[in-house]
Amino acid sequence: MSDHSPLALAQALIRCPSVTPEEGGALSFLADRLSRAGFSVERPVFSEPGTPDIQNLYARIGTAGPVLVFAGHTDVVPPGEVGSWTHGPFSGEVAEGFLYGRGAVDMKGGIACMLAATLAFLDRHGPDFGGSIAFLVTGDEEGPAVNGTVKLLDWAKARGERFDHCLLGEPTNPDTLGEMIKIGRRGSLTGRITVHGRQGHVAYPHRAENPIPGLLRLASALTADPLDGGTAHFDASNLEFTTIDVGNPATNVIPASAKAVFNVRFNDDWTADTLGAEIRRRLEAAAGNAVRFSLDLQPSNSPAFLTQPDAFVDRVADAIEAETGRRPALSTTGGTSDARFIKDACPVIEFGLVGRTMHETDERVAVADLDRLTAIYGRVLDAYF
């Protein structure tokens, strides 16, 4: 097996135990392979009070534009109970056509394919290919994500680095390679409602004020009518209550307060501010003078965004169709990713492996998919430069 093969590269990365925040040797392996290929490689470490220091990697070959960035992360979630794995989570074993290991799908397999495609491209064209290729890789995507891509981009900008397009290799396909390109992501907003009552004995309700009916009234106000009907590239925004709690184990006490937490995944009809204002309007209308409540809104660093379909999106879609025989859907579904940071530096889209087993025991990827994804990335490079 060639050491340029995506399987060999993925196995080497999986064998690095890089559970966030540990680097585990994964970035060191990547840095070595890129520097041997002629890349200039740097390893900035970023810090934030109360969080662990995180190692990152920035590599570039070429000095001219256009600049295509491959982005991703080498950190992985914990493997859980190791004894439950059919093959060790950091073994990188192959069985029945599948590569097993934590990060096989999310997303060491994707990084291996990016690296393999780039090495093959440089073997074909040499270092003077009419542009630049950069790798932007963090060890802080699965964790707090405060010392990773967001700071790496600021660091690169301060050095005068400018990017034209970015391809993020997150696992975007639900079931089959080639199904889906992510061209945007929904925003996320978390809210906490507290309804204030007055504690008392259930036998004397006139001496108390039960907050629970009021909380149910407010919850109904947020869920009775849809927030919107969706937009051209986004489904309708969705509000889900995730917990309701009174902290009251007693059966004969009316609680003093009742609390609920909700999360909204919102589309590009909204910003965090406009959505927050709509939520507050609905709650105040439902509460009137009958329900005393407080609302704490916590916007994440995940606004809704959309990369408009353009020639770059078409190039990636063409490459996928050429290798898989299917035209990928352009989607904005799913959770958040580091694309939420990259969008401020350049247009970004996401395409990677099949995500069905990510974060699961026995996370695995079909070896054939590694080869096909490498070929897709190779076609993108050939079309881009």
Curated annotation (Swiss-Prot):
Residues the record lists as binding Zn(2+) 2: 106, 142, 359
Catalytically driven reaction(s): N-succinyl-(2S,6S)-2,6-diaminopimelate + H2O = (2S,6S)-2,6-diaminopimelate + succinate
SUPFAM superfamilies: Bacterial exopeptidase dimerisation domain, Zn-dependent exopeptidases
Cofactors: Zn(2+); Co(2+)
A GO MF label: zinc ion binding
GO terms of biological process kind: diaminopimelate biosynthetic process; L-arginine biosynthetic process; lysine biosynthetic process via diaminopimelate
Similarity annotation: Belongs to the peptidase M20A family. DapE subfamily.
Task performed by this protein: Catalyzes the hydrolysis of N-succinyl-L,L-diaminopimelic acid (SDAP), forming succinate and LL-2,6-diaminopimelate (DAP), an intermediate involved in the bacterial biosynthesis of lysine and meso-diaminopimelic acid, an essential component of bacterial cell walls.
Subunit-level organization: Homodimer.
UniProt-recorded name of the protein: Succinyl-diaminopimelate desuccinylase
Gene name for this UniProt entry: dapE
